[in-house]
């Protein structure tokens, strides 16, 4: 990993989500280099964002499960309001990126943060408000390369919690789930039985069919049928690097 000290971060304003073939964009994000220098900003995952703008509203409580390097959540926050975002990420080093990007773009705090994995079992011994905190490395240097922690390859013993347990402990119930967890999608849903059953959630999930099969012996059909068992119907949005779906009870 390459680290960049906070004082050495170079910031750029990046236009994101081009409006057709015009020179107009839906968003202008303040991003750090080298992230800001990507060449994908015109249309990256545009189908997901358009679906979110169609289905979501200000005030929706949005659980972002797999916040990663901390830029997509800036767009989600614009849609539902930054004060309604719950940021969830297991990789310790990403928390500095998430923190730096968040406060470069917003002056209000997110609703909550959870530094850990979400899955089908709970190993996290923290309780209550201790589960709502920025990752311990959030004030450190940012990283400029991707580094992931996986449920199946958790060599750092990152704590894990079921979504149902998190909801119960912190007292926050989501309206929206956004899940991008590199193949472990079904495990997250299996830890969210009560929340899925008791609510009509708006669910955006990126299904990684290759990683799910390789690392978790799970097919996309397994994940889709599990959600259908709770009364959810799916809408396929797009497939580029993974398959993007939207689910709700209809």
Where are the regions that the model predicts?
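S-adenosyl-L-methionine
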Residues: 1-106, 150-152, 170, 219-226, ...
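Glycine-rich adenosyl-binding loop in Rossmann-like folds that engage adenosine-containing cofactors
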Residues: 21-50, 108-109, 114-172
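Conserved Rossmann-like nucleotide-binding pocket used by diverse enzymes
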Residues: 63, 86, 114, 159, ...
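Short, glycine/acidic-enriched loop or turn micro-motifs at the edges of active sites
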Residues: 67-69, 92, 120, 181-183, ...
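Hydrophobic packing residues within well-ordered alpha-helices of enzyme cores
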Residues: 76, 98, 102, 126-127, ...
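Conserved acidic-Pro-Pro-aromatic motif
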Residues: 86, 165-250
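Acceptor-substrate binding/catalytic loop of class I
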Residues: 93, 152-158, 207-217
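Short helix-capping segments at alpha-helix termini
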Residues: 104-109, 196-200
């Amino acid at each position: 990993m390459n680290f960049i000290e906070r004082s050495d971060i170079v910031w750029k304003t990046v236009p994101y989500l081009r409006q057709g073939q015009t020179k107009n964009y839906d968003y202008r994000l303040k991003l750090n280099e080298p992230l800001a220098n990507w060449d994908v900003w015109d249309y990256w995952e545009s189908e997901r964002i358009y679906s979110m703008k169609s289905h979501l509203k200000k005030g929706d409580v949005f659980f972002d499960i797999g916040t990663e390097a901390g830029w997509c959540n800036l767009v989600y926050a614009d849609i539902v309001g930054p004060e309604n975002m719950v940021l969830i990420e297991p990789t310790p080093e990403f928390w500095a990126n998430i923190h730096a990007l968040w406060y470069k773009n917003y002056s209000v705090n997110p609703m909550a943060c959870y530094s850990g994995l979400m899955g089908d079992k709970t190993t996290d011994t923290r309780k209550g408000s201790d589960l709502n905190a920025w990752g311990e490395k959030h004030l450190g240097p940012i990283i400029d390369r991707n580094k992931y922690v996986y449920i199946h390859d958790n060599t750092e013993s990152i704590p894990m919690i079921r979504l149902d347990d998190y909801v119960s402990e912190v007292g926050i119930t989501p309206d929206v789930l956004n899940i991008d967890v590199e193949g472990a999608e079904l495990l997250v849903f299996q830890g969210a039985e009560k929340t899925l059953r008791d609510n009509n959630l708006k669910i955006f999930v990126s299904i990684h069919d290759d990683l799910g099969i390789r690392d978790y012996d799970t097919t996309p059909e397994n994940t889709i049928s599990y959600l259908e068992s709770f009364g959810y119907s799916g809408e396929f949005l797009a497939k580029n690097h993974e398959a993007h779906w939207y689910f709700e009870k209809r």
